[in-house]
Amino acid sequence: MNGAIEPRTQGEPGPAPEWAGEEPLVFELGGDLGVAPREVEVGVTTRPLAALLPGVALRAAPPAFPAVPEPVLARHLGRLARRNHNLHQGIYPLGSCTMKYNPVVDEELARLAGFADIHPYQDAGDVQGALQLMWELERLLCEITGMARISLQPAAGAHGEWTGLRMIQAYHAARGDTHRSRVLIPDSAHGTNPASATLAGLEVVTIRSNPDGTVDVADVARHLDSRVAAIMMTNPNTLGVFEKDVLEIARIAHAAGALLYYDGANLNALVGLARPGDMGFDVVHLNLHKTFSTPHGGGGPGSGPVGVTEALTAFLPLPTVERDGSRYLLDHDRPLSIGKVRSYYGNFGMLVRAYAYIRAYGSSISEVAENAVLNARYLQSRLRGIFPMAVTSESMHEFVATTKGSRVAGLRALDVAKRLLDYGVYAPTAYFPTTVPEALMFEPTETESKRSLDLLADVCAAIVAEAERDLDHLRSAPHETPVSRVDEVEAARRPVLRWRPVE
């Protein structure tokens, strides 16, 4: 990167006066409606609403919906969009989230009328194309993961975890093994793992990690007994390190009657190269909105399909999609199923996008993992002289750095993350995993170029150099974003989630 790096803001140069300070809420906009189309006489007789709905309680006054002209609303939304970072603006190295660029063609395919304008309760004969896509996607995902069958119903990764654990419970119950109520989970696991286990009514037992970041096999063996239903693992783990002892863990788990659960959050490092089923995993959940390039979106639209080995197929959520000759059908006759876990059949639009993504790569899908690992290792090599690394093990698709022990005493991960925003660069995940103090987790994904990786590394170097000169300036960052630091404690204790009119 040539020349000095200076903080910059996203958006247009020379902002208009309305950019100054906070963007008003849509309720605060309004005013002259301008020129509007004239109302057309349609010859429809009108009647009072009370006469049309006798006996129904009606509002005394209309709701306080904003009356905003369309041009004003369009500009308001445009300004908000420019204030938010996104992949159209630059790299998004949010560790453990796989924020890759999603191909626009997948969006176009998901909007085809034959997919977008159908209803899930139409007769199966009317939606053969949609059922065929689901049937074929299941088999593609089975080939990628090494599973026997997959349910496409779960709507997110954590939902998939809960679904997988419910199938594990059903499996043990069907064998009369009803006293298995514990789940072993590594200390570096995603927080959704213990949350999902608790929601399923299981007791969580934490397994410690080795200094190299991998699961301590001896600690697993110490906790394995007849009360353990499953072990949940992520591979590579949340430190970006491949679990080299996974085959041994699978062996001792199965010998003790427990099952091995695969959190597919990090499958982007392995897709096309290695399969969880070949490692001994019995249940797998995937994040289509990570590995298979469907959109991320605040709690949805996500998709967290769950795959199982042959021994657990009877417990899959119903219905499943089956093929009878050239016809596709929905099978509701599954007496051992855990039942439905989602309205309809899952987030179908996400399935269309993932299917298109996988078919576009075809047999070359291993390039996803190869380039994801290459990018992460290159970025890590650039940052080694800037931040200490959490572990010395070679990373896969992501890695964890730390500001603890850096050449600037008192440098915090939060300050680095906030200052990055001033440079128009999105921050890595901070303070996760919790086993690493002052953690910064970077995941560049396979869709980034060397130029964008160099930009991120150079900005990090500039921030550390700045901290050596004036650490207090970082402590108050960001300085050039529309919103600076917020009171996170107040926001957590007293969240304001809706607009209320001034009394």
For each feature predicted by the language model, list its residue ranges:
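Conserved phosphate/anionic-ligand binding catalytic regions in large, soluble enzymes, centered on
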Residues: H85-D106, Q153-E161, F292-G307, A311-L312, ...
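A short, small-residue-rich loop immediately preceding and capping a beta-strand
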Residues: A148-P154, R182-I185
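General small-molecule cofactor/ligand-binding pocket signal
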Residues: S151, V205-I207, P428
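Non-catalytic terminal extensions of PLP-dependent enzymes
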Residues: M1-R149, R166, A274, D324-V341, ...
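Short, flexible loop/turn elements at secondary-structure junctions
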Residues: T98, A156, A189, N237, ...
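Long, C-terminal catalytic modules of enzymes
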Residues: P301-P305, T309-Y344, F348, R353-S363
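Conserved PLP-enzyme active-site core in the AAT-like
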Residues: G129, H159-G325, L411, P437-E438
